[in-house]
C-alpha cells in the first residue's frame, strides 16, 4: 500500500500545481474568446456558407469549425473537460495546501527558546528590567489591537487575521461552484430565438407536449434618433400559464425573468408590408431578408401583370421607409413612404399603407444561473478575505531581555516596521 501511494501523491501534486491551474485558466479564457468571435448555436449550414470562401481568422473553414465543435463552444466536450480538469485541480490544491494552511493558522505553536524565535522571518530583542511586567504590558497592547493572545509563564503567543486563511479556500470554492453552474447550464439549459409580429404568440411546451407558457406580443416599438438610427426597441408582452397571467415590457438590457425563463429583447426585423396595387384591397404581404444586399435589407418580388410577368422588387431598410421599387434591370422606379401617396409603377398606382416590424426575442432557460451567482458571491467574499494579512507573534522574557519574533503571509515589510515600535511602546510604558 505504501509503495502505491507514491505515484498517487505525485499525480495529486501535479494536478494541484499552480502552473497547471494557470495554463487551464488561459485555455478556458482562449476558448471563451473563440466562442465570442464565432456565432454560437446557428444552423450548421450557416457556418459552411460563412467560412467556405473566407476561413475564420484565415485558418478554419466551416467544416473544421463544426468538427472542432466551435459552433457550440460552451457545451462542447473539450470545453467541459477543461472545466472539470480545472475544478479537480482547485479541489486538490485546497485539500493539499489551503486546508493544512488554515489548520496551521488555527493551531497554537509554543516556542520555548529565544533561539527558536531568532530563526523566524522577523525577530527583535529589547532590554527589559522587569521582563514579567514587560510581557504583561505586551499582552495588554496586543489585546487592545485586536490580537488573540495565549499567555504562558515567561512567554506568550499571539495571532491576528487568521480569518484571512479562509479566503483562498472560499476563492477555490467559488470558482468550483461557478464552473459547476456553467456546466449545468450548458448541459441542461435551453435557448430559443424567434421573431414575433404584434398579435402573434409563441407556445412553450413541456416534455409531454402540454403548453407550459404562452408568450404573446401585444406591441413592438422602435425608438430612433433624429437621424433615424436605432436607439432602443421594446416589446409589450403578455405571458399566460396555468392559472396565471402577466403583462410586462422588455427592452435591450432589460430582460424579463419568469419561472426560470429569461426573455431578452435581442433584435428586430420587418414582418409584413401592407400594399394597395391599383384598385385592389390592401394586401398584407410577408417580407424576407436579403443578406446579399446588406445587413438590414428586407423586400419582396411583386408581379405587375396578371400572368406574372414584369416583376418589380420592393426593398426597405426600416419600418419608416421609404420602400424603393426597382425593375428587373435594377432601375429605380419609385419611392413610397408608408401612409404616403401612391406612385405609378409599370402603369399601376401603388401605395404602401404600413410596414409591420417584428420583435426578435431570445428565450433562455439556464438552471445553472443560481449556482453561478452563488459562486460569484463566494468568490468575492473569498477575494476580500484573502486580502487580510495573517500575522503570528511570539514573545519570550528571559535574562532581562524581551525577545519577540513573528511571521506574516502578506506585507512583511510593514510588520517588520511595526514590531520594533511595539517593543519600544512596551519599554516606554514600563519606564513611565
From Swiss-Prot:
Entry keyword set: Cytochrome c-type biogenesis, Membrane, Thylakoid, Transmembrane, Transmembrane helix
Q: What are the annotated GO cellular component locations? A: plasma membrane-derived thylakoid membrane
Q: Which domain of life is it from?
A: Bacteria
Classify the protein's membrane topology as the record does: Multi-pass membrane protein
State where it is primarily located.
membrane
Listed transmembrane segments: 18-38, 76-96, 166-186
Q: Which family does it belong to?
A: Belongs to the Ccs1/CcsB family.
User: What is known about its subunit structure?
Assistant: May interact with CcsA.
Report what the protein is called: Cytochrome c biogenesis protein CcsB
In which organism is this protein found? Synechococcus sp. (strain CC9605)
